[in-house]
Amino acid sequence: MTGDHRTNFPPHDNPLHDSKDVPQFAPNFSVYVLPPDAVCLYSEDRKFFLHGELYCALASAIGEGGRSFRQLVRELGRDFPSDKIHEALKRLLDRRYVVAESPSSAGAAAAYWASLGLPLETAEANLRNCRVRIRSIDVEGGAGLGAALAALGVRVVKRSPDLTVTLVSDYLEARVAALNRKHLADQTPWLLVQPSGIFPLVGPLFSPGNTACWTCLSDRMMRNREVKGLLDRVPARAVAVSPLACNTFGQSAIQLAAVEIAKAIATDFRTDLRDHIISLDLLGSTIAKHYVAARPQCPSCGREELRDPGRKPAPIELGPGAKLVMTSGGYRTVSSRATVARFRKHVSPLTGVVSRLERIDADLPLNTNFHATHNFSGPARTVNELRANL
């Protein structure tokens, strides 16, 4: 079996193998019978083998289609014990190798949900119960995204949404701050998408009281985009604007956004989009995730007692702890490797507390030390300050 990328969902409870429902193999699998006694269930990310003549007979009968669970038991009962047939069918159902046939189970979307380990009926119910409105701020792509979402089963509406998807040309667009305040006041979830440019972005989900807000995100992004931060702080006047600033290049960004949003809704927002930005690099053809942390001291959504930047600092309390003998000649309570593993999600050129982390090459192979390549200087107010900081 290859790596499993599924979300964990509970197994089936209904004993379908005693019903009149017609079984079919899960739509994410192509199924091969290897005589005399092996069956291969093949997908791009998972491969399974079933062994035994009973599984070969079941696979052939299910693959032909049209027979109910009850009919399968009756027909195969001529050659195999009834209890063994029931046991094999139960195993196929519990592992979701086999599902009950439905009109919508033959499509590519059904195969995708099955690849996630998500029952089709659950995905369809979640998609049906979440109304999505598309809103654009000076950027194209709204109509295309709406059509792509609808094709995946998302319920796109013009009013009374359960989720608002806002398209922008820049995540640091000043008008987004007002939208953030409104959603925080209304306690309504929303999501950002930047379909334009050569580095399109999707997410994260902003769910007031549950996740980070846009102010949390903008604080991190501004510190990682020093030049853009300067342009926003000083009276800079745009005399020419790149066509890529407000226009999509191809359909990659729109389709990525549609799939990620539909996946989040179908799984009841149990995906990385809940607390990550998904970025697409159209130059290097790579996709990356960037963690978005909820800041306890955020002036918009943080804890009331921590919002005042002039508050009295809490004293640091030192206490006894175990120490590790290190080959570097010093002592630590936690190894460098363990520290990096714990805080790796906070390393990002987009949203990280540290933009990049690199391992220090050393002659001693047991040394595992790292250094941060990050600009920790304060926000520049002039071009000269920016040059000095960089």
Please tell me what each predicted stretch does.
Residues 3, 43-156, 181, 192, ...:
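Long, charge-rich, low-complexity alpha-helical segments
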Residues 28, 34, 44, 101, ...:
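Structured loops at beta-to-helix junctions and adjacent beta-edge loops in soluble globular domains
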Residues 30-33, 157, 362-363:
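Short secondary-structure boundary/capping segments within folded domains
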Residues 68, 157-160, 382, 389:
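Alpha-helix N-cap recognition
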Residues 139, 145-152, 160-255, 263-269, ...:
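E1/E1-like adenylate-forming module used to activate ubiquitin-like modifiers
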Residues 3-4, 10-21, 44, 54-55, ...:
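Helix-coil modules at protein/domain termini and other flexible surface or pore-lining loops
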Residues 2-49, 170-173:
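Conserved, charge-rich beta-strand/loop surface module that forms ligand/interface-binding patches
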